[in-house]
Amino acid sequence: MGDSESVNQDHGRNTFLSRVFGLQPDDITTSIRTGDMSRYPLNAYSGGSEMFSGSPTSSRIDDDDDDDEGRVPESDQQSSSGDNSDDIKANDDVIEDVELTDGNGDNYTNSKMINTNYSIFGSLRKVGQQSSDEEDDGSLSNEEEDIDEEDEIDEIDADEPLFVNSTSQRKQKRKSSVNFKNGSEMSSLLFQRILNKKDSKSNGEASNKMFTSSNQGNHNYKYRNGHDLEGGVHFNKKEGRRNSLFGSHEAGGHKSHNSAPSKGPNLLKNISILNNTPSNKVYTLSPKERALWKWANVENLDVFLQEVYKYYLGSGFSCIVLRKLLNLTTLIFVVYISTYLGYCIDYSKLPTSSRLSDIIIDQCYTTRITGITKGLLWVFYVFVGLKVVQFYFDLQNLTDMHNFYNYLLGISDNELQTIPWQNIIQQLMYLKDQNALTANVVEVKAKNKIDPLVVANRIMRKDNYLIALYNENILDLSLPIPFYKESILTKTLEWNINLCIIGFAFNESGFIKQSFLKKSQHQFITEELRKRFMLAGFLNIILSPFLVTYFVLLYFLRYFNEFKTSPGTIGARQYTPMAEWTFREFNELYHIFQKRLGLSTVIADKYINQFPKESTDLILKFISFISGSFVAVLMSLTLLDSENFLNFEVTKDRSVLFYITVFGAIWSVCRNSISDEYKVYDPDETIKELSEFTHYLPKEWEGKHHTEDVKQEFCKLYNIRLIILLRELASLVLTPFILWFSLPACSDRIVDFFSDSSTYIDGLGYVCKYATFGINQANAQKVKGGKRHQDMKMNTNNFSNEVINESDEDVLDSDSDSEIDSNDKMMRSYMYFMEDYENSENAIGKNQLPRKKYKDPSLTNPSLNTDYSWRKQFQPGQRPELFRIGKHALQVPTNVRNLGKKSTLNSENPYDNSSNLGESFINPTIMPDRDLGRNGVNGGKKEAGMLRMVKDYYKTSDIGR
């Protein structure tokens, strides 16, 4: 037939398969041949829709295509309360503006306007939940007529091919078919018929060939359209280079020192064996086929991506297995050594014995250990047995993840220890482009939305809520003591909060429960949360004696040798758990955050040590003199009679050797704690430098960086390690009181927080609204009092429009400073997120540091920078084009009380260091966007002056407000 007819058929085939199987239009052309799909009937579709007719010219999609893109129901499938009468109403008539994309941000082009009444491309609903059309439009009309018409069509089109070969054939089929009211009603029946026929034997051969791609076809297609189907990368014929997530790499040119090889996932060239493989026969496949089967049958993308990230953090199969074994061995050793020293040693014989065998009690575990202690040991044995069983199942999951990395992503365990996480994201995007086949059709849409932002939101779905929860000061973590309201967060209390709040708010699939979002369920959920706090406090009281004993022994065995060999480390500092939640940005993965925080400790010590402590130094010098004098006298006498004097008892049962050890340790601690006599004193510049790592510089500290008050506030966040350990031990006893008295009073605010901070993203589900950065939120529906309502329409070409439009309504209606701080933190998190993923200099391994920059290219062997001058990598890039912050950010709401106390937009920062603005401190090269929902550089307009003011505001004066 003519060229127009063939183009129409190819276009219709590509559009259909791209939406059903998640494949991209470019991937389908050479992967599926017309003969492979000849068994699927499409008489009704060819006769009633205009998608496969007309000239192949570019056209737009009407704004009325709201029903074409169904909402993926990635949320709770059931309510914890059992009250179904107050479910979110399905007739809210929410209008969603949907723009079909091919996964890389390019719009699909159709020959004519797409019929908008009903489409086969809506997402299938999950079991137990309404479909998108039922939620948005109430219910499908004329269901009985549709069923009758569907049965009638199945009889007529039983043997009709999916894609007819000529116009005459289409006309002939159209004449013999039943006339329907419109083409959209006919198209709505196609997908169900295909699903009903996919297991039939007559279609078995076609199914096996459905995803088979020939080498020759891929070769021709690569040079015709510039995309390598099997290689997973884009190939530019004219420039001879391959495009990656961070830009273009010249073929044969100089390769970046920190970029891993950009190679596509290694997929099977023929996966027909996987089409009919049931789940109970998966392990009969080869490791490569099994890895592909697991990827194709991902049921929960959140859990899968979290496992992918945990595997990356663990540095591969061998390291994770070794770590699990050593942790279990450590637990067994601590329990064994404590029971052995407590029941198997006769300490009364120790002074008169010279051998170990003289003081050991034989068969102590059977004769000395009885009663409660023996019962607890048996409980421990059962616990160890359960850990071994769990380790066995973890080993199977690790094997599957190892195969996924090795065969599909093409990354070995050795490479995993040095490869950047950005490269893992890149490989996942390539894998999604090559094969998005899935057994769970709802996940097709989710897999089509794999990009750095979506992956971070799925991995940190719960952590983002916790970041907002701690930063908005909703939790009362103080002891129920009058006139003592200091919040103390320890790891034990943090674990209980996760168990009581996060474990209750999210279901087993990792999605937030709908009952938390309904106003009608508010009172019930609040009472249930109070009961959980009370129950957790009761369990902590029961377990506290055993936990205290275990952790005392663990900390003693872990830190005693360190303190003995290096007594100066007793005064070492580390960040508290509250500081970690305060400093962490939204969507900031754990390894990026830990690296940033670890690199800040040197500057934090520098800031604290700048403050003079004359009185403390005088006392330390005196103590070191006294202790040093005793050590000198005892050592001198030891030299006179070294054989006898060391065992000489100075006091009862305390020899000379004992006192030499004690006084020596005291002298060492005091000498190491004395501050240097001369040092540079510039706390303002130091804390500004520190804030580039911590992203925390409250407005209240401005102009007071040199004062003792600011230093003490910072020391609460960066405390002495020994004090933190003592607090951890004390919290094992004090945590039950916080769970009983303080946290239950916050239950109402906690439930309100989840309702107000949740927003729905199509294909992603409910996430924390601050973690979305306001990008591509046109389809998002906020949850307010248990009802969905449409967000105001936002301009996706300008980030500031999206952020301000999304949040200014809340800010205008809110008088709380925490709401303003959260929105500022959201914008700041976006800036650092873009810097982490778009700056190629940050594409380094989780344990690596960036190299120093040299302007002279002749320096081929530069030394690594160890003076922390590369700290600017954690500061957002200075190129105005990278951040779409326009003049809207400077519009200060007039009806918000006390806003002037928080804003410094119209005031000059005395510590502004903007003389070198205009170029990024790390890499001035602007990398192309990929799947981040961002367009070009504002149409080429220069807005550097306004953008510079806003960036200075968020980087200097108000960092971490």
Swiss-Prot record:
List residues in topological domain: Cytoplasmic.
Answer: 1-324, 396-536, 558-617, 676-721, 743-961
Q: How is it modified after translation?
A: Phosphorylated by ATG1. ATG1 phosphorylation is required for preautophagosome elongation.
What biological process terms from GO does the record include?
cytoplasm to vacuole targeting by the Cvt pathway; mitophagy; piecemeal microautophagy of the nucleus; protein localization to phagophore assembly site; reticulophagy
Molecular-function annotations in GO: phospholipid scramblase activity
For side Lumenal, which residue ranges? 346-374, 639-654
Give TM regions. Answer: 325-345, 375-395, 618-638, 655-675
**Is Methyltransferase given among the entry's keywords?**
no
Q: Which Pfam families does the UniProt entry name for this protein?
A: ATG9
Any keyword Nucleotide-binding?
no
Listed Polar residues bias regions? 203-219, 900-918
Where in or outside the cell is it found?
Preautophagosomal structure membrane; Cytoplasmic vesicle membrane; Golgi apparatus membrane; Endoplasmic reticulum membrane
Which InterPro entries does the record cross-reference, listed alphabetically? Answer: Autophagy-rel_prot_9
Q: Listed GO cellular component terms?
A: autophagosome; cytoplasmic vesicle membrane; endoplasmic reticulum membrane; Golgi membrane; mitochondrion; phagophore; phagophore assembly site membrane
Which UniProt keywords are present, listed alphabetically?
Autophagy, Cytoplasmic vesicle, Endoplasmic reticulum, Golgi apparatus, Lipid transport, Membrane, Transmembrane, Transmembrane helix, Transport
Enumerate composition-biased segments (Acidic residues).
132-160
**What are the residue boundaries of the intramembrane regions?**
537-557, 722-742
Q: How does it sit in the membrane?
A: Multi-pass membrane protein
Q: Which reaction does it catalyse?
A: a 1,2-diacyl-sn-glycero-3-phosphocholine(in) = a 1,2-diacyl-sn-glycero-3-phosphocholine(out); a 1,2-diacyl-sn-glycero-3-phospho-L-serine(in) = a 1,2-diacyl-sn-glycero-3-phospho-L-serine(out); a 1,2-diacyl-sn-glycero-3-phosphoethanolamine(in) = a 1,2-diacyl-sn-glycero-3-phosphoethanolamine(out); a 1,2-diacyl-sn-glycero-3-phospho-(1D-myo-inositol-3-phosphate)(in) = a 1,2-diacyl-sn-glycero-3-phospho-(1D-myo-inositol-3-phosphate)(out)
Outline the segment boundaries, as ranges, of region: Disordered: 1-91, 126-180, 198-225, 244-265, 900-940
Give the domain note: Forms a homotrimer with a solvated central pore, which is connected laterally to the cytosol through the cavity within each protomer. Acts as a lipid scramblase that uses its central pore to function: the central pore opens laterally to accommodate lipid headgroups, thereby enabling lipid flipping and redistribution of lipids added to the outer leaflet of ATG9-containing vesicles, thereby enabling growth into autophagosomes.
The similarity annotation says: Belongs to the ATG9 family.
How does the annotation summarize its subunit structure?
Homotrimer; forms a homotrimer with a central pore that forms a path between the two membrane leaflets.
Q: What does this protein do?
A: Phospholipid scramblase involved in autophagy and cytoplasm to vacuole transport (Cvt) vesicle formation. Cycles between the preautophagosomal structure/phagophore assembly site (PAS) and the cytoplasmic vesicle pool and supplies membrane for the growing autophagosome. Lipid scramblase activity plays a key role in preautophagosomal structure/phagophore assembly by distributing the phospholipids that arrive through ATG2 from the cytoplasmic to the luminal leaflet of the bilayer, thereby driving autophagosomal membrane expansion. Required for mitophagy.
Q: What is this protein called?
A: Autophagy-related protein 9
This chain's source organism reads Vanderwaltozyma polyspora (strain ATCC 22028 / DSM 70294 / BCRC 21397 / CBS 2163 / NBRC 10782 / NRRL Y-8283 / UCD 57-17) (Kluyveromyces polysporus)
Which gene underlies this protein? ATG9
